[in-house]
Design a protein with these regions (language model features):
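Conserved catalytic core of the tyrosine transesterase superfamily
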Residues: 1-322
């Protein structure tokens, strides 16, 4: 039975199966497609073929939404239209969306000393014996921040990790069901795996059947403010520069790219692997990092002319990097 209700449901189901087979269907995809489905059913209940009017009315920016929100809301429908065009199932044209406001944020460039001081501070958090919340904080901070640093995971992905998705035998984390992002797998470094195993054993003594890997004293997952606040407090205790927990993800990408500059490599293969491991929907999103690595374009030109032109074109920033 179809989950869609409009007369376009057969086409939507067809599109959904295609995206699932391509590993490009997430929970957020479901919500966005259902929104367009309801739009079609409410305003065009008798239409069993896609029309320009149906699409244009959906793409119109709403008074209550930002330009970026409008672009995100319409992105999947754009892909749906392109999918139908390629199969000659529609003549509808993808409407031009409002230009996205570019993010001018420059991630913090961590120094070795800053990171060393930060992780040392994490390892030496003190707690009172009768304060379970402080004890859990002292156990969690060294592990979750090292996890972000060593894997490039999004902060929301780390906070949303369920125990069932963390394979501590093989050292593989499954990122599934995270709103708006592709499902993917992350392989842990041996040292990170050992930390995760030790942490899990300690947490099992407190909450034997917990659902989430990282939980508070109430046995519920931490919220984003807990991660943000604790990173800031610990960071500010040993460093004077400004940085955020999400900068650890940026650092992961940039460090990988910098390491490649001293190797013989195929840029396309490397960036494809990095893109997949970071859960980017498209390679275009991974290319963002090339714009913030100093002098990378000249290094690339010297090492590989073949893929230089592929990297250099303007980056499509439809996918959020945050």
């Amino acid at each position: 039975m179809t989950e869609f209700i409009s007369k376009l449901s057969p086409l939507m189901e067809q599109f959904k199966k295609y995206r699932k087979a391509s590993q490009k269907w997430s929970r957020d995809s479901h919500y966005k497609m259902r929104a367009f489905d309801r739009h079609c059913n409410e305003l065009y209940p008798e239409n069993d073929k896609l029309t320009q009017k149906m699409v244009d009315s959906f793409f119109a920016k709403r008074p209550t939404e930002t330009i970026n929100s409008c672009r995100q809301r319409c992105y999947l429908v754009s892909e749906f239209i392109k999918y139908l065009q390629e199969r000659e199932q529609t003549n509808v044209i993808v409407p031009e969306r409002p230009r996205k406001r570019r993010n001018t944020y420059i991630p913090h460039a961590f120094s070795h000393e800053e990171l060393s001081d930060f992780f040392e501070a994490c390892d030496n958090l003190r707690y009172l014996p009768n304060r379970i919340d402080m004890k859990i904080r002292s156990m969690t901070a060294p592990v979750i921040f090292r996890l972000l640093y060593s894997t490039g995971m999004r902060t929301i992905e780390a906070l949303s990790l369920r125990c069932e998705h963390v394979d501590l035998t093989e050292g593989v984390i499954s990122i599934v069901g995270t709103k708006g992002y592709n499902e993917h797998y992350i392989v842990l470094h041996d040292s990170m795996l050992e930390l995760m195993q030790q942490f899990n054993q300690k947490m099992d003594c407190i909450f034997p059947n917990r659902e989430y890997f990282f939980v508070s004293k109430d046995n519920v997952r931490f919220n984003s403010s807990w991660l943000t606040d604790n990173f800031r407090i610990i960071w500010d205790s040993v460093n004077s520069s400004h940085a955020t927990a999400y900068d650890l993800r940026h650092n992961y990408a940039i460090e990988n790219i910098n390491r490649w500059t001293n190797e013989g490599f195929n840029f396309y293969d490397k960036i494809a692997y990095l893109s997949k491991s970071m859960g980017h929907v498209t390679l275009e999103s991974t290319k963002y990092y090339y714009s913030i690595v100093p002098n990378l374009s000249s290094i690339m030109m010297n090492q590989t002319i073949e893929t230089f032109d592929w990297i250099v074109p303007e980056v499509n920033t439809d996918e959020e990097i945050y």
